[in-house]
């Protein structure tokens, strides 16, 4: 019995060990303090609702209040850190919630909502995963972040430039000669470069279209696999990452005039069982529903409406042409036409 209790404890701790944290948020977006767990697949819905967009399914999570519907944030910045369930964030300024059922997610739905509603204003949309060399830039992000390092070779070269963080960060036990350490440091360099490049285009943070930033950091996870989570390198990297995230949150929050939401997701590891289950459903063979009787396809429900509109318009035009032609054919120029009548009167007067 005691063994079952211990196993259940570790199971619950592993399921709820990850965290979803709010680093910065404006007064118009209200996040309540509490220990309410948030499902991992509903994090995009939290980001969408905080920006004022609608979602397909209602979110019955008490952590997010209604807030000011007429004053929404100008930007949402979400940073996901892999390899750690939680970071030693300063208490008081950060609101954290347990994250349950941590599955891979993306903010594509939020990006699509921004594109559909603000297509003419070309907002900034940046989704970046430096360790996987994945980048997605749309709108004004192409011009603002065109000099941003996105490949592993570019990240390595950026670190050894004169104005890089490598010359100012306290590396402690980290080494600049190790590829894993350089990967972690290059992700911190990306955070610094994003805020630095945006500071050169401050007018983009003051327009009316909302912006979206989604960043995935896996350098700490690689350090844990290389040195171990109890190693000095992992502890030093965690402290450096916390300081870098705090500075990045302050910079982005300040650039948007205090009207931005900065969110952090820390995931030790994703629940592969849930991912595998969803994949088996998507990869299931589709049944052949084609009828062997060569039946006609089902027409659109609006077909009858369009058909009646076209039919009666054509009938009305045909009747108008027939009536007009009949009247012209039987018209008496002397009496039915005002042109000839006026001409005859004028002739009589003359």
Curated annotation (Swiss-Prot):
Motif (Mediates retrograde transport to the ER): 346-350
Topology in membrane: Single-pass type I membrane protein
Residues in compartment: Extracellular: 18-302
Taxonomic superkingdom: Eukaryota
Pfam families: Renin_r, RENR_N
Chain segments annotated as transmembrane: 303-323
Residues of the site described as Cleavage: 276-279
GO-annotated cellular components: autophagosome membrane; axon; clathrin-coated vesicle membrane; dendritic spine membrane; endoplasmic reticulum membrane; endosome membrane; external side of plasma membrane; lysosomal membrane
GO molecular function: signaling receptor activity
Cytoplasmic-facing ranges: 324-350
Keywords from the UniProt entry: Cell membrane, Cell projection, Cleavage on pair of basic residues, Cytoplasmic vesicle, Endoplasmic reticulum, Endosome, Lysosome, Membrane, Phosphoprotein, Postsynaptic cell membrane, Receptor, Signal, Synapse, Transmembrane, Transmembrane helix
Posttranslational mods: Phosphorylated. Proteolytically cleaved by a furin-like convertase in the trans-Golgi network to generate N- and C-terminal fragments.
Subcellular localization, as worded in the UniProt entry: Endoplasmic reticulum membrane; Lysosome membrane; Cytoplasmic vesicle, Autophagosome membrane; Cell projection, Dendritic spine membrane
Free-text disruption phenotype from the record: Conditional knockout mice lacking Atp6ap2 in glutamatergic neurons display increased spontaneous locomotor activity and altered fear memory; show abnormal number and morphology of synapses, presynaptic transmission and autophagy defects that lead to axonal and neuronal degeneration in the cortex and hippocampus. Conditional knockout mice lacking Atp6ap2 in the liver display liver damage, hypoglycosylation of serum proteins and autophagy defects. Conditional knockout mice lacking Atp6ap2 in cortical neurons die around 4 weeks of age.
InterPro entries xref list: Renin_r_C (IPR056780), Renin_rcpt (IPR012493)
One GO biological process term: central nervous system maturation
Tissues in which the UniProt entry reports expression: Expressed in glutamatergic and GABAergic neurons with highest levels in the cortex, the hippocampus, the medial habenular nucleus, the cerebellum, the medulla and the olfactory bulb (at protein level).
Stretch forming the signal peptide: 1-17
PANTHER family per record: RENIN RECEPTOR
Function description: Multifunctional protein which functions as a renin, prorenin cellular receptor and is involved in the assembly of the lysosomal proton-transporting V-type ATPase (V-ATPase) and the acidification of the endo-lysosomal system. May mediate renin-dependent cellular responses by activating ERK1 and ERK2. By increasing the catalytic efficiency of renin in AGT/angiotensinogen conversion to angiotensin I, may also play a role in the renin-angiotensin system (RAS).
Subunit structure: Interacts with renin. Accessory component of the multisubunit proton-transporting vacuolar (V)-ATPase protein pump. Interacts (via N-terminus) with ATP6AP1 (via N-terminus). Interacts with ATP6V0D1; ATP6V0D1 is a V-ATPase complex subunit and the interaction promotes V-ATPase complex assembly. Interacts with TMEM9; TMEM9 is a V-ATPase assembly regulator and the interaction induces the interaction with ATP6V0D1. Interacts with VMA21 (via N-terminus); VMA21 is a V-ATPase accessory component.
Protein name in UniProt: Renin receptor
Organism: Mus musculus (Mouse)
């Amino acid at each position: 019995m005691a063994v079952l209790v211990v196993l259940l404890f570790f199971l619950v701790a592993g399921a709820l060990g990850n965290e979803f944290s709010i680093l910065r948020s404006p007064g118009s977006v209200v996040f309540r303090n509490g220990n309410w767990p948030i499902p991992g697949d509903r994090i995009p819905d939290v980001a969408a609702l905080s920006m004022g967009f609608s979602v397909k399914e209602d979110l019955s999570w008490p952590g997010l209040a209604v807030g000011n519907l007429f004053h929404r944030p100008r930007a949402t910045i979400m940073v996901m850190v892999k390899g750690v369930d939680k970071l030693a964030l300063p208490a008081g300024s950060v609101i954290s919630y347990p994250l349950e059922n941590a599955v891979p997610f993306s903010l594509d739905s939020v990006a699509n909502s921004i594109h559909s509603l603000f297509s003419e204003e070309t907002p900034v949309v940046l989704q970046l995963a430096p360790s996987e060399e994945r980048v997605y830039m749309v709108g004004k992000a192409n011009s603002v972040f065109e000099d941003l390092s996105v490949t592993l070779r570019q990240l390595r070269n950026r670190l050894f430039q004169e104005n890089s963080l490598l010359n100012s960060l306290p590396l402690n036990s980290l080494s600049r000669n190790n590829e894993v350490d350089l990967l972690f440091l290059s992700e911190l360099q990306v955070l610094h470069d994003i805020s630095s490049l945006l500071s050169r285009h401050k007018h983009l943070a003051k327009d009316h279209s909302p912006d979206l930033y989604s960043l995935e950091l896996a350098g700490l996870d690689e350090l844990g696999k290389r040195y171990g989570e109890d190693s000095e390198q992992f502890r030093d990297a965690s402290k450096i990452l916390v300081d870098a995230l705090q500075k990045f949150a302050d910079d982005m929050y300040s650039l948007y005039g205090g009207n931005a939401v900065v969110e952090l997701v820390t995931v030790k590891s994703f629940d592969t069982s849930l991912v595998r289950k969803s994949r088996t459903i998507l990869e299931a063979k589709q049944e052949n529903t084609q009828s062997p009787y060569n039946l006609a396809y089902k027409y659109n429900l609006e077909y009858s409406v369009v058909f009646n509109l076209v039919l009666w318009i054509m009938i009305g035009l045909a009747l108008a042409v027939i009536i007009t032609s009949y009247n012209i054919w039987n018209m008496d120029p002397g009496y039915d036409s005002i042109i000839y009548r006026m001409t005859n009167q004028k002739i009589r007067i003359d």
